[in-house]
Amino acid sequence: SDCLERRAQKSFPNALTVHRLDMDTSGLMVMGLNKFAHRHLSLQFQNRNVGKTYFAWVYGNLKKEEGMIDLPIICDWDNRPKQMVHFKNGKPSQTKWHVIKKNKNKTLVRLIPITGRTHQLRVHMNELGHPILGDRFYAHDQALNMSYRLCLHATEITVMQPIKKTKITFKAPVPF
């Protein structure tokens, strides 16, 4: 089957994926071009030493300009691959958010995940009552119909270069 890792391996035979994006999310992904780089980059993600920034259009206008969402998330086994907030058994999940721009019935937000749970940003924004536009799993009909695609984009990632030990930041412009 067609996947990013196989495409990268045509030019870089030892390339390995370090982390994933949800299938409908656009933006940056990190790959190690050899086993050494893959190991060091993977440890940075595991130890939460990677800076990640996403942009998203969400439904409605948030009342505050910024905030922190701290809600535990667990797999919704009856509705996989959906996730849900579950205070008893969920894994700790935190997301910082900041309003960038407000329009009539939508808001552009910067999202910074502190943890990296599956669908974390999507679940957290939905729990605030502001689902991400075009989200076929979590958005209500009105928010779903406001975009033909999921309006969630991994726009910036900062990692430590494994050999030089210097921070490097990669950026991808927002396509929506």
What residue spans do the PLM features occupy?
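RNA pseudouridine synthases
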Residues: 1-94, 101-104, 151, 175-176
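Pseudouridine synthases involved in rRNA/tRNA modification
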Residues: 120-176
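Short, low-complexity Ser/Thr-rich regulatory SLiMs
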Residues: 99-101, 161
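Short histidine-centered loop motifs in beta-beta connectors
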Residues: 109-112
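Short beta-strand segments
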Residues: 67, 71, 93-95, 107, ...
